[in-house]
Amino acid sequence: MLKREIFPVANIYVPTARRKTLDLKRVDAIAHSMLTEGQQTPILVRADGARFVLVECLHRLEAAKALGEATIVGYRVEARKH
């Protein structure tokens, strides 16, 4: 079972391909929701040495950054093994 953790926003790397899907209107809507209701959905990251790589929830991470949050709630997942 996954356990919620607190991750430093500055230590989360967003892959270039994932960054290309960013929708600023969606980021604004999620940021507004986070202000009024808090973070409802954890992000997904995987460990990569001293940092973490974003797996899911780009818009949620960017909303947290826009709000000036230093940390974000998420789940640490394992990298897929091929």
Model-inferred region functions:
Residues 1-78:
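Short, charged/polar connector segments at secondary-structure boundaries
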Residues 82:
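Short, charged recognition helix plus adjacent turn
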